[in-house]
Amino acid sequence: MSKNLLIELGLEELPAYVVTPSEKQLGERLATFLTENRLSFEDIQTFSTPRRLAVRVSGLADQQTDLTEDFKGPAKKIALDADGNFSKAAQGFVRGKGLTTDAIEFREVKGEEYVYVTKHEAGKPAKEVLLGVTEVLSAMTFPVSMHWANNSFEYIRPVHTLTVLLNDEALELDFLDIHSGRVSRGHRFLGTETTITSADSYEADLRSQFVIADAKERQEMIVEQIKTLEVEQGVQVDIDEDLLNEVLNLVEFPTAFMGSFEAKYLDVPEEVLVTSMKNHQRYFVVRDQAGHLMPNFVSVRNGNDQAIENVIKGNEKVLVARLEDGEFFWREDQKLQIADLVAKLTNVTFHEKIGSLAEHMDRTRVIAASLAKEANLSAEEVTAVDRAAQIYKFDLLTGMVGEFDELQGIMGEKYALLAGEDAAVATAIREHYLPDAAGGALPETKVGAVLALAAKLDTLLSFFSVGLIPSGSNDPYALRRATQGIVRILDHFGWRIPMDKLVDSLYDLSFDSLTYANKADVMNFIRARVDKMMGKAAPKDIREAILASSTFVVPEMLAAAEALVKASHTENYKPAVESLSRAFNLAEKADASVQVDPSLFENEQENTLFAAIQGLTLAGSAAQQLEQVFALSPVINDFFDNTMVMAGDQALKNNRLAILSDLVSKAKTIVAFNQLNTK
């Protein structure tokens, strides 16, 4: 008869960002433990709050399944001595399996007999197996951990309780310095210690103590309460998904409420108000039906609605202090001059090994000018790029950004417009930070995109030049994100800028502040980001073939990868790749100094292939170019069928290899076909 298992770990308050991943990890680790220990089950449900992680297993088997395993030992000729008795090798083998030589039998494998033993292990009761379940808890990993009391072990937070129930029976286990039982803790202020009656009564027992154990249910409660406030007040609430996920992991019993602030603060830029509410206070933003910001907010209390008026007043008071700061900085920053702030950037360190922020900006300006030409920007856009590159970090020295660093770039745009800067310049100041996260928004303007590329390129080259190169998962300066941004921007705008030539040109630049170094490492790093951009949809051989092509133009490489993936599912892919791969491999033997001499052709197939190569223009999309190359496959095969490439005559051999070399020089601009796998 199956049973239900409950495990709850009661902890000190957890950081919100670790709650959901830890809940998931607990469920996955327990499922693995049960599977490895041959305990079948029907379902696993996980629970979490800021003060507990829990999991319930439904339909858990009463005992392990029996195990029967066959083990192969030494060959018969080794297992028996000259007298036909079992040798020490055979005896040692069975002893290691906990058996005797009586269990030995011989089985033939590929014409030779070997020792085999069969071991039967009866399944243990589930209750006995579960005594080892604390290894699941011990194996949990967290981004941070701590010691407490006089203990030598570390964990995410101090552990207060451990509840392990098999149906309604409490199992006795020890974890860290805690002995398990059936006692759990209710809400920190509204509840008390409580007894969990059974695995099935878990949610109900905690609910009576003002704890909603199911995170999904808490989320639904929060959303429903906010929707009710929307209807009652006739407003719209921005239910930001990230904020919602954070808030639900800050409360055990949610109660949403609406507060307000004076309308005068709406004169402050919306971004300042939203940042104050959302990022600093974890409040939801309120708008009218037209989408305009209102002097209200929605917050979620960790508790019921008792004395909610006092809670609202307290939250309003805290927010007003933030808004006062924002209003003050908004007013005072407008008195500052951009030129004065830029001049002070010489005293702001970009990195102690690299130099000042002003020096970083100087290098960025030079790179931006070069990129503007490569991207064929208009004269007006070139002027805007140059101006933006001179001032784009000035807002870092404003009071607002000093207080709300999330607003860097955003306030730069606003202050630049107030100072009379061109709109394209102001927008570029904001957009040069983009994308600011994996998959984040990209610059929308060419001016902003060029400035973003230039700033990211100097950041990448500067850090690599002083040896600050990411290793493993360690990337403290977010260079992977910056480089991924470079790749995404180039692809988004379709700028066909050869990265190898661009980087070469940057290394030719001379700056008093820094000399770029470690070019090979930089190129490999960029290649790795392009590889990542090609994604899991492109198999490893396709990605490697693209990266080994002779062209390093990001949009073309990504398009070629997509085209190759689609082509790989067609009938002519395998024969076309095989003929091209053969041509690529032979072309490696060609003498680069030899030019094709048509007078040395001995058959029609040589002439036909040479003419086809001469006519190969590789125009259109990546898919169209791929089709053009694949169309040569029959011609290449005819050539190989009727021509001895490695002829005894040196002149003929060199001429035929030169034909193939001409083919490869064109085809390799798309893909290194000999890197593709057709097996």
Curated annotation (Swiss-Prot):
Which keywords appear in this protein's UniProt record, sorted alphabetically?
A: Aminoacyl-tRNA synthetase, ATP-binding, Cytoplasm, Ligase, Nucleotide-binding, Protein biosynthesis
Q: Which GO terms describe its biological process?
A: glycyl-tRNA aminoacylation
UniProt GO cellular component terms:
cytosol
Reactions accelerated catalytically: tRNA(Gly) + glycine + ATP = glycyl-tRNA(Gly) + AMP + diphosphate
Q: Which domain of life is it from?
A: Bacteria
One Pfam family recorded for the sequence? tRNA_synt_2f
Localization per record: Cytoplasm
Q: How does it assemble?
A: Tetramer of two alpha and two beta subunits.
Q: Which HAMAP family match?
A: Gly_tRNA_synth_beta (MF_00255)
Q: What is this protein called?
A: Glycine--tRNA ligase beta subunit
Query: What organism is listed for this UniProt entry?
Result: Streptococcus pyogenes serotype M1
**What is the gene called?**
glyS
